Design a protein with these regions (language model features):
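Glycine-enriched, solvent-exposed interface loops adjoining structured elements
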Residues: 1-248
Length: 248
C-alpha cells in the first residue's frame, strides 16, 4: 500500500494479512474470519502501546485548569484532568497569572512534609498526581490558570464523526501514526502471538520506530554553558514562603 496521511483499520488489517499470506477482507468489523479479527485486535494493541512509547507531537495537546480554593487556607485540592489525559509533558506546567513555573511533581514524602507542617505555599503552585487527579498545594482564593502540555491517549479517530478515540473498531476508523509503524508493529505482534519467530518482524519495526521518533520533532541544541534551570538543591524545602532574609 502507498503511504497515506490517514491509514484506516481496514488498510492496516489488509496490509498485514497480505504480508503474511492471508486473504484480504472487505469488512473487518463484520468478518467471520478469526484470523482477520485477531489482526484487528493486534492493531489496537499496537496503537495503544505506541501511544506511550514516545512523546509524539501529534498526540501532544495544550490545556489549562483554573485553580481556585473552596475556602481560604485550604491545604490541598484535587482537580479533574482532561478526559483524554495520558501523561504530562515534563516541565510544561506554568501559572499563567504569575508567569512562574509550577513546582512538581512533588513526591509523596515531600507532600506529606508540607501537609503535616501545615505549610501554606502562596508564591508558587505545587502539584502532584494522585488517584488520577491533579492535586494543588494551598490553592489560591482567586482563580489562577494552571497551564500545561500533555499526551493524549486518543491515538485513533472515528471515521464518521472525526471524534478522537483510543481504538479503531470500524473499517474507516483511522490512526494518527505514520502508516508503516502501525503496519510493522501489528505484523510483529501477529508473528509473536501466532507462534512464529517474530525477531525479524520486530527488527523491521524497530528500524521504522527509531526513524520516526528521530524526525517526529526538532531536537534541542546541546550546550556546555550552564543552563537556565533553578540552582536550588530542593525547591520545595530550601525556599521560605515569606521573609527572604528580611527578618520575617
Amino acid at each position: 500500500m502507498s503511504a497515506a496521511a490517514q491509514t484506516t483499520l481496514l488498510e492496516v488489517v489488509n496490509s498485514v494479512a497480505q504480508s503474511v499470506g492471508h486473504p484480504k477482507t472487505t469488512d473487518v468489523s463484520s468478518s467471520q474470519d478469526e484470523s482477520i479479527l485477531r489482526i484487528a485486535y493486534y492493531a489496537n494493541i499496537a496503537g495503544t502501546e505506541l501511544s506511550y512509547a514516545a512523546n509524539w507531537q501529534w498526540l501532544t495537546k495544550v490545556s489549562e485548569i483554573q485553580i481556585v480554593a473552596d475556602f481560604p487556607a485550604q491545604t490541598e485540592k484535587a482537580f479533574d484532568l482532561p478526559t483524554d489525559f495520558h501523561a504530562f509533558i515534563d516541565d510544561t506546567q506554568w501559572n499563567r497569572s504569575t508567569q512562574l513555573p509550577a513546582i512538581g511533581p512533588i513526591n509523596s514524602q515531600d507532600w506529606q512534609w508540607l501537609i503535616v507542617r501545615k505549610t501554606m505555599i502562596t508564591t508558587r503552585m505545587m502539584w502532584r498526581i494522585r488517584n488520577k487527579k491533579l492535586w494543588i498545594k494551598s490553592p489560591p482564593v482567586n482563580s489562577q490558570p494552571f497551564s500545561f502540555e500533555y499526551l493524549s491517549k486518543n491515538w485513533a479517530v472515528d471515521g464518521n464523526t472525526e471524534t478522537p478515540q483510543d481504538l479503531m473498531s470500524k473499517n474507516i476508523d483511522y490512526h494518527l501514526y505514520p502508516w508503516q509503524l502501525m503496519v510493522l508493529y501489528t505484523r510483529a505482534k501477529w508473528f509473536e502471538n501466532e507462534g512464529y519467530d517474530s525477531s525479524g518482524a520486530y527488527e523491521d519495526f524497530k528500524r521504522a520506530f527509531m526513524y520516526e521518533t528521530g524526525v517526529d520533532k526538532a531536537a534541542t541544541a546541546l550546550t556546555l554553558v550552564p543552563g537556565q534551570g533553578y540552582p536550588y538543591i530542593d525547591a520545595v524545602k530550601n525556599i521560605p514562603d515569606t521573609g527572604y532574609g528580611f527578618g520575617g
